[in-house]
Amino acid sequence: KGSNDAWGSQFDADRIELLQRMADQIWEIDSTIYIVLEHFAENAEEIELADHGMLLWGNSQYNYAEASMGYHSNGKSDFSWGYYGSRGWGKPHLVSYFESHDEERLMYKNLSWGSSAGDYNIKDIHTAISRVKAVGAFFFTIPGPKMIWQFGELGYDNSIDDPCRLCEKPILWAYFEDYERIRLYKTFQALIQLRQQYPVFNSSNTEVDMDLGSSTGMKRIRLSLNNEQVVIIGNFNVVNQSMDPNFYHTGTWYDYFTGDSTFISDLNELINLDPGQFHIYSNFYIDPPEENLLSAQTESSFLPNTIEIKQNYPNPFNPSTFIQIASNGDKQTSLQIFDINGKLVDTLIDQNFISGINTYQWNAFSFPSGIYIARLSSGVTSKSIKMLLVK
Protein backbone atom coordinates (compact mmCIF):
# COMPACT_ATOMS: atom_id res chain seq x y z
CA LYS A 1 0.00 0.00 0.00
CA GLY A 2 1.19 3.55 -0.61
CA SER A 3 4.82 3.71 -1.74
CA ASN A 4 5.36 -0.05 -1.80
CA ASP A 5 2.62 -1.07 -4.27
CA ALA A 6 2.94 1.51 -7.03
CA TRP A 7 3.63 -1.37 -9.41
CA GLY A 8 0.09 -2.60 -8.84
CA SER A 9 -1.44 0.27 -10.77
CA GLN A 10 1.14 0.34 -13.57
CA PHE A 11 0.33 -1.01 -17.03
CA ASP A 12 0.80 -4.79 -16.96
CA ALA A 13 0.33 -6.72 -20.21
CA ASP A 14 0.53 -10.08 -18.42
CA ARG A 15 -2.26 -9.10 -16.05
CA ILE A 16 -4.41 -7.94 -18.95
CA GLU A 17 -3.90 -11.27 -20.71
CA LEU A 18 -4.80 -13.22 -17.56
CA LEU A 19 -7.99 -11.24 -16.96
CA GLN A 20 -9.04 -11.52 -20.59
CA ARG A 21 -8.44 -15.27 -20.52
CA MET A 22 -10.54 -15.68 -17.36
CA ALA A 23 -13.31 -13.53 -18.80
CA ASP A 24 -13.37 -15.56 -22.01
CA GLN A 25 -13.65 -18.79 -20.02
CA ILE A 26 -16.57 -17.40 -18.03
CA TRP A 27 -18.36 -16.18 -21.16
CA GLU A 28 -17.97 -19.62 -22.77
CA ILE A 29 -20.20 -20.93 -19.99
CA ASP A 30 -22.63 -17.99 -19.97
CA SER A 31 -22.23 -15.17 -22.48
CA THR A 32 -24.71 -12.94 -20.59
CA ILE A 33 -22.66 -12.65 -17.40
CA TYR A 34 -21.47 -9.20 -16.35
CA ILE A 35 -17.83 -9.17 -15.26
CA VAL A 36 -17.17 -6.17 -13.02
CA LEU A 37 -13.65 -5.33 -11.87
CA GLU A 38 -12.54 -3.26 -8.89
CA HIS A 39 -9.27 -2.64 -10.70
CA PHE A 40 -7.88 0.93 -10.52
CA ALA A 41 -4.89 0.50 -12.83
CA GLU A 42 -3.46 2.89 -15.41
CA ASN A 43 -6.11 4.23 -17.78
CA ALA A 44 -4.42 2.53 -20.75
CA GLU A 45 -4.84 -0.84 -19.05
CA GLU A 46 -8.45 -0.17 -18.11
CA ILE A 47 -9.23 0.77 -21.72
CA GLU A 48 -8.00 -2.64 -22.93
CA LEU A 49 -10.12 -4.44 -20.34
CA ALA A 50 -13.17 -2.31 -21.14
CA ASP A 51 -12.74 -2.90 -24.87
CA HIS A 52 -12.65 -6.63 -24.16
CA GLY A 53 -16.13 -6.39 -22.59
CA MET A 54 -15.46 -6.08 -18.87
CA LEU A 55 -16.93 -3.37 -16.62
CA LEU A 56 -14.67 -1.42 -14.28
CA TRP A 57 -15.45 0.61 -11.19
CA GLY A 58 -14.90 4.36 -11.53
CA ASN A 59 -14.41 6.11 -8.20
CA SER A 60 -15.73 9.68 -8.28
CA GLN A 61 -16.44 9.98 -4.56
CA TYR A 62 -13.92 12.71 -3.76
CA ASN A 63 -15.07 15.07 -6.50
CA TYR A 64 -18.81 14.58 -5.97
CA ALA A 65 -18.33 14.98 -2.21
CA GLU A 66 -16.40 18.23 -2.64
CA ALA A 67 -19.18 19.52 -4.90
CA SER A 68 -21.82 18.45 -2.41
CA MET A 69 -19.99 20.12 0.51
CA GLY A 70 -19.45 23.30 -1.52
CA TYR A 71 -15.69 23.32 -2.10
CA HIS A 72 -14.41 24.04 -5.61
CA SER A 73 -10.85 25.41 -5.60
CA ASN A 74 -8.28 23.88 -7.97
CA GLY A 75 -10.89 21.80 -9.77
CA LYS A 76 -11.48 19.56 -6.75
CA SER A 77 -15.23 19.30 -7.48
CA ASP A 78 -14.77 18.38 -11.16
CA PHE A 79 -16.34 14.92 -11.48
CA SER A 80 -16.00 14.65 -15.26
CA TRP A 81 -13.64 11.65 -14.81
CA GLY A 82 -16.77 9.72 -13.84
CA TYR A 83 -17.81 9.74 -17.51
CA TYR A 84 -16.19 7.06 -19.64
CA GLY A 85 -15.81 9.45 -22.58
CA SER A 86 -13.62 11.78 -20.51
CA ARG A 87 -11.16 8.91 -20.12
CA GLY A 88 -10.99 8.26 -23.85
CA TRP A 89 -12.92 5.00 -23.56
CA GLY A 90 -14.76 3.82 -26.65
CA LYS A 91 -17.23 1.66 -24.74
CA PRO A 92 -19.53 2.69 -21.86
CA HIS A 93 -18.03 0.19 -19.42
CA LEU A 94 -17.16 2.54 -16.56
CA VAL A 95 -19.33 1.92 -13.47
CA SER A 96 -19.10 5.31 -11.79
CA TYR A 97 -20.12 5.92 -8.18
CA PHE A 98 -19.99 8.55 -5.44
CA GLU A 99 -20.32 6.10 -2.52
CA SER A 100 -19.16 2.54 -1.93
CA HIS A 101 -18.15 0.12 0.81
CA ASP A 102 -14.76 1.87 0.87
CA GLU A 103 -15.82 5.51 0.63
CA GLU A 104 -17.37 7.90 3.15
CA ARG A 105 -21.05 8.77 2.78
CA LEU A 106 -21.95 12.08 1.14
CA MET A 107 -24.52 12.94 3.79
CA TYR A 108 -22.04 12.31 6.59
CA LYS A 109 -19.56 14.65 4.89
CA ASN A 110 -22.25 17.27 4.30
CA LEU A 111 -23.32 17.24 7.94
CA SER A 112 -19.74 17.17 9.25
CA TRP A 113 -17.86 19.53 6.95
CA GLY A 114 -20.38 21.28 4.71
CA SER A 115 -19.72 24.90 3.77
CA SER A 116 -22.00 27.83 4.66
CA ALA A 117 -22.73 31.47 3.90
CA GLY A 118 -25.23 33.59 5.82
CA ASP A 119 -28.35 31.54 6.56
CA TYR A 120 -27.40 28.83 4.05
CA ASN A 121 -25.62 26.00 5.86
CA ILE A 122 -24.92 22.61 4.29
CA LYS A 123 -24.57 21.13 7.79
CA ASP A 124 -28.31 21.65 8.21
CA ILE A 125 -30.06 18.31 7.58
CA HIS A 126 -32.58 19.73 5.09
CA THR A 127 -29.90 21.53 3.11
CA ALA A 128 -27.62 18.50 3.23
CA ILE A 129 -30.34 16.34 1.68
CA SER A 130 -31.04 18.91 -1.03
CA ARG A 131 -27.34 18.89 -1.95
CA VAL A 132 -27.49 15.13 -2.54
CA LYS A 133 -30.45 15.71 -4.88
CA ALA A 134 -28.25 18.06 -6.90
CA VAL A 135 -25.48 15.45 -6.98
CA GLY A 136 -28.01 12.93 -8.30
CA ALA A 137 -29.02 15.29 -11.10
CA PHE A 138 -25.39 15.43 -12.26
CA PHE A 139 -24.79 11.71 -11.74
CA PHE A 140 -27.68 9.75 -13.21
CA THR A 141 -27.96 11.96 -16.30
CA ILE A 142 -24.44 11.11 -17.53
CA PRO A 143 -24.46 8.09 -19.91
CA GLY A 144 -22.86 4.90 -18.63
CA PRO A 145 -23.63 2.41 -15.83
CA LYS A 146 -23.91 3.68 -12.24
CA MET A 147 -23.62 2.24 -8.75
CA ILE A 148 -25.28 3.54 -5.60
CA TRP A 149 -24.49 2.18 -2.15
CA GLN A 150 -26.84 0.99 0.58
CA PHE A 151 -29.40 3.63 1.58
CA GLY A 152 -27.55 6.32 -0.39
CA GLU A 153 -30.89 7.04 -2.07
CA LEU A 154 -32.20 7.99 1.38
CA GLY A 155 -29.22 10.05 2.51
CA TYR A 156 -27.39 7.48 4.67
CA ASP A 157 -25.47 9.54 7.22
CA ASN A 158 -23.77 6.92 9.38
CA SER A 159 -20.01 7.22 8.97
CA ILE A 160 -18.12 4.44 7.23
CA ASP A 161 -16.15 4.13 10.50
CA ASP A 162 -19.27 3.68 12.67
CA PRO A 163 -18.85 1.32 14.40
CA CYS A 164 -15.75 0.41 12.31
CA ARG A 165 -14.79 0.42 8.63
CA LEU A 166 -15.32 -3.33 8.18
CA CYS A 167 -18.22 -3.72 10.61
CA GLU A 168 -21.79 -4.37 9.54
CA LYS A 169 -23.56 -1.05 9.18
CA PRO A 170 -26.91 -0.17 10.79
CA ILE A 171 -29.89 -0.96 8.55
CA LEU A 172 -31.98 2.19 8.95
CA TRP A 173 -35.43 1.23 7.70
CA ALA A 174 -36.81 4.16 9.69
CA TYR A 175 -35.54 6.42 6.92
CA PHE A 176 -38.64 5.39 4.99
CA GLU A 177 -40.71 7.22 7.60
CA ASP A 178 -38.78 10.47 7.17
CA TYR A 179 -40.54 12.93 4.85
CA GLU A 180 -37.36 14.67 3.63
CA ARG A 181 -35.55 11.40 2.93
CA ILE A 182 -38.52 10.06 1.00
CA ARG A 183 -38.37 13.12 -1.25
CA LEU A 184 -34.68 12.37 -1.88
CA TYR A 185 -35.60 8.75 -2.68
CA LYS A 186 -38.27 9.90 -5.14
CA THR A 187 -35.88 12.40 -6.72
CA PHE A 188 -33.40 9.60 -7.42
CA GLN A 189 -36.29 7.50 -8.71
CA ALA A 190 -37.34 10.27 -11.11
CA LEU A 191 -33.77 10.66 -12.38
CA ILE A 192 -33.37 6.92 -12.94
CA GLN A 193 -36.64 6.88 -14.89
CA LEU A 194 -35.10 9.43 -17.27
CA ARG A 195 -32.26 6.99 -17.95
CA GLN A 196 -34.68 4.15 -18.52
CA GLN A 197 -37.05 5.99 -20.85
CA TYR A 198 -34.95 8.39 -22.93
CA PRO A 199 -31.88 7.26 -24.93
CA VAL A 200 -30.20 10.67 -24.68
CA PHE A 201 -29.40 9.83 -21.04
CA ASN A 202 -28.01 6.35 -21.65
CA SER A 203 -26.89 5.91 -25.25
CA SER A 204 -23.23 5.46 -26.16
CA ASN A 205 -24.01 7.66 -29.18
CA THR A 206 -24.98 10.66 -27.04
CA GLU A 207 -22.71 13.67 -27.50
CA VAL A 208 -21.70 14.84 -24.03
CA ASP A 209 -20.36 18.34 -23.33
CA MET A 210 -19.41 19.07 -19.71
CA ASP A 211 -18.34 22.24 -17.91
CA LEU A 212 -17.71 21.05 -14.36
CA GLY A 213 -14.38 22.47 -13.20
CA SER A 214 -15.17 26.12 -12.43
CA SER A 215 -14.00 27.45 -9.07
CA THR A 216 -17.41 29.16 -8.76
CA GLY A 217 -19.16 25.81 -8.34
CA MET A 218 -21.43 26.49 -11.32
CA LYS A 219 -21.77 23.31 -13.38
CA ARG A 220 -23.32 22.42 -16.72
CA ILE A 221 -23.83 19.24 -18.75
CA ARG A 222 -25.14 19.29 -22.33
CA LEU A 223 -26.45 16.13 -24.00
CA SER A 224 -27.40 15.65 -27.65
CA LEU A 225 -28.70 12.60 -29.49
CA ASN A 226 -30.40 12.98 -32.87
CA ASN A 227 -33.16 15.53 -32.26
CA GLU A 228 -33.10 15.25 -28.46
CA GLN A 229 -31.11 17.84 -26.54
CA VAL A 230 -30.78 18.31 -22.78
CA VAL A 231 -29.09 21.05 -20.75
CA ILE A 232 -28.44 20.52 -17.03
CA ILE A 233 -27.26 23.46 -14.93
CA GLY A 234 -26.59 23.64 -11.20
CA ASN A 235 -25.17 25.92 -8.52
CA PHE A 236 -22.98 23.93 -6.12
CA ASN A 237 -21.81 27.07 -4.33
CA VAL A 238 -23.31 28.43 -1.10
CA VAL A 239 -24.29 31.82 -2.57
CA ASN A 240 -26.69 32.91 -5.29
CA GLN A 241 -25.13 33.03 -8.78
CA SER A 242 -26.07 33.25 -12.46
CA MET A 243 -25.02 30.94 -15.29
CA ASP A 244 -25.00 30.88 -19.07
CA PRO A 245 -27.05 27.75 -19.98
CA ASN A 246 -25.67 27.64 -23.54
CA PHE A 247 -28.87 26.18 -24.99
CA TYR A 248 -28.53 24.32 -28.28
CA HIS A 249 -31.15 26.37 -30.10
CA THR A 250 -33.87 28.96 -29.67
CA GLY A 251 -37.45 27.85 -29.12
CA THR A 252 -39.32 26.01 -26.39
CA TRP A 253 -37.47 24.19 -23.61
CA TYR A 254 -39.04 22.24 -20.74
CA ASP A 255 -37.99 22.04 -17.08
CA TYR A 256 -38.26 18.37 -16.06
CA PHE A 257 -39.08 18.68 -12.36
CA THR A 258 -41.71 21.41 -12.78
CA GLY A 259 -43.06 20.63 -16.25
CA ASP A 260 -42.89 24.36 -17.04
CA SER A 261 -42.02 25.49 -20.55
CA THR A 262 -39.78 28.43 -21.44
CA PHE A 263 -39.34 30.08 -24.81
CA ILE A 264 -35.66 30.79 -25.38
CA SER A 265 -34.76 33.63 -27.74
CA ASP A 266 -31.24 34.26 -26.38
CA LEU A 267 -29.15 31.08 -26.10
CA ASN A 268 -26.82 32.67 -23.56
CA GLU A 269 -29.17 34.69 -21.37
CA LEU A 270 -28.05 34.18 -17.78
CA ILE A 271 -30.21 32.09 -15.45
CA ASN A 272 -30.17 32.90 -11.74
CA LEU A 273 -29.69 29.94 -9.39
CA ASP A 274 -29.99 29.78 -5.62
CA PRO A 275 -27.30 27.78 -3.79
CA GLY A 276 -27.89 24.08 -4.38
CA GLN A 277 -30.48 24.74 -7.10
CA PHE A 278 -30.43 22.89 -10.42
CA HIS A 279 -32.54 22.53 -13.56
CA ILE A 280 -32.83 19.80 -16.18
CA TYR A 281 -34.01 21.39 -19.44
CA SER A 282 -34.99 19.39 -22.53
CA ASN A 283 -36.16 20.44 -25.98
CA PHE A 284 -38.86 17.74 -25.80
CA TYR A 285 -41.63 17.38 -23.25
CA ILE A 286 -41.21 14.84 -20.44
CA ASP A 287 -43.98 14.12 -17.98
CA PRO A 288 -42.78 15.71 -14.71
CA PRO A 289 -42.46 13.58 -11.58
CA GLU A 290 -44.35 14.13 -8.34
CA GLU A 291 -44.69 17.79 -7.39
CA ASN A 292 -42.50 19.54 -4.82
CA LEU A 293 -39.69 16.98 -4.74
CA LEU A 294 -37.12 19.78 -4.85
CA SER A 295 -38.96 22.33 -2.73
CA ALA A 296 -37.40 23.57 0.50
CA GLN A 297 -40.82 23.95 2.12
CA THR A 298 -41.66 22.12 5.33
CA GLU A 299 -43.88 19.08 5.59
CA SER A 300 -46.89 21.09 6.76
CA SER A 301 -46.85 23.05 3.48
CA PHE A 302 -47.92 19.94 1.58
CA LEU A 303 -50.78 18.72 3.74
CA PRO A 304 -54.01 18.17 1.78
CA ASN A 305 -57.38 19.63 2.71
CA THR A 306 -58.68 16.18 3.75
CA ILE A 307 -56.70 12.96 3.28
CA GLU A 308 -54.37 11.73 0.57
CA ILE A 309 -52.67 8.44 -0.29
CA LYS A 310 -49.55 8.42 -2.46
CA GLN A 311 -48.64 5.65 -4.90
CA ASN A 312 -46.69 2.95 -3.08
CA TYR A 313 -42.97 2.50 -3.64
CA PRO A 314 -41.45 0.43 -4.92
CA ASN A 315 -44.12 -0.75 -7.34
CA PRO A 316 -44.08 -3.52 -8.53
CA PHE A 317 -42.66 -4.93 -5.31
CA ASN A 318 -41.52 -8.12 -3.58
CA PRO A 319 -42.01 -8.81 -0.73
CA SER A 320 -42.68 -5.43 0.90
CA THR A 321 -43.63 -1.90 -0.10
CA PHE A 322 -44.20 1.50 1.52
CA ILE A 323 -47.40 3.55 1.47
CA GLN A 324 -47.41 7.24 2.36
CA ILE A 325 -50.56 8.96 3.59
CA ALA A 326 -51.27 12.56 4.59
CA SER A 327 -54.02 14.27 6.57
CA ASN A 328 -54.71 17.85 7.65
CA GLY A 329 -56.77 16.92 10.66
CA ASP A 330 -57.07 14.41 13.50
CA LYS A 331 -59.64 11.82 12.40
CA GLN A 332 -60.41 8.14 12.74
CA THR A 333 -58.57 6.65 9.77
CA SER A 334 -58.09 3.17 8.34
CA LEU A 335 -55.61 1.87 5.78
CA GLN A 336 -56.66 -1.54 4.48
CA ILE A 337 -55.41 -3.92 1.81
CA PHE A 338 -57.80 -5.79 -0.51
CA ASP A 339 -57.11 -8.41 -3.16
CA ILE A 340 -58.35 -8.01 -6.74
CA ASN A 341 -61.63 -9.75 -5.80
CA GLY A 342 -62.37 -7.19 -3.10
CA LYS A 343 -61.52 -9.44 -0.16
CA LEU A 344 -59.95 -7.69 2.83
CA VAL A 345 -56.55 -9.31 3.41
CA ASP A 346 -54.79 -6.93 5.80
CA THR A 347 -55.27 -3.80 7.90
CA LEU A 348 -52.28 -1.53 8.42
CA ILE A 349 -53.93 1.12 10.59
CA ASP A 350 -57.33 1.67 12.15
CA GLN A 351 -56.97 4.51 14.61
CA ASN A 352 -57.15 8.24 15.20
CA PHE A 353 -54.69 9.66 12.67
CA ILE A 354 -52.76 12.74 13.78
CA SER A 355 -52.34 15.52 11.22
CA GLY A 356 -49.18 15.10 9.15
CA ILE A 357 -47.46 12.80 6.66
CA ASN A 358 -46.72 9.21 7.63
CA THR A 359 -45.34 6.16 5.86
CA TYR A 360 -46.40 2.55 6.48
CA GLN A 361 -44.76 -0.65 5.33
CA TRP A 362 -46.80 -3.57 4.03
CA ASN A 363 -45.07 -6.93 4.21
CA ALA A 364 -46.63 -9.33 1.71
CA PHE A 365 -44.50 -12.37 2.52
CA SER A 366 -47.51 -14.65 2.89
CA PHE A 367 -49.53 -13.35 -0.05
CA PRO A 368 -49.45 -14.58 -3.66
CA SER A 369 -48.49 -12.47 -6.66
CA GLY A 370 -51.22 -10.25 -8.00
CA ILE A 371 -52.89 -6.85 -7.94
CA TYR A 372 -53.83 -5.46 -4.52
CA ILE A 373 -55.78 -2.36 -3.56
CA ALA A 374 -54.71 -0.12 -0.69
CA ARG A 375 -57.73 1.85 0.54
CA LEU A 376 -57.46 4.87 2.82
CA SER A 377 -60.71 5.83 4.58
CA SER A 378 -61.41 8.75 6.90
CA GLY A 379 -64.96 9.83 7.70
CA VAL A 380 -66.92 9.90 4.43
CA THR A 381 -63.76 10.16 2.31
CA SER A 382 -62.09 7.12 0.75
CA LYS A 383 -59.14 6.95 -1.67
CA SER A 384 -57.38 3.94 -3.21
CA ILE A 385 -54.27 2.93 -5.12
CA LYS A 386 -53.38 -0.22 -7.06
CA MET A 387 -50.26 -2.19 -6.12
CA LEU A 388 -48.56 -5.04 -7.98
CA LEU A 389 -46.91 -7.86 -6.03
CA VAL A 390 -44.59 -9.94 -8.24
CA LYS A 391 -42.87 -12.98 -6.73
Residue ranges and their predicted role:
Residues 265-293:
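C-terminal beta-strand-rich structural cap/linker in extracellular carbohydrate-active enzymes
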Residues 269, 279, 356-362:
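Short strand-edge motifs at loop-to-beta-strand transitions and within beta-strands
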Residues 298-313, 317-337, 358-364, 377-381:
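Glycine-centered coil/turn sites that cap beta-strands in beta-rich domains
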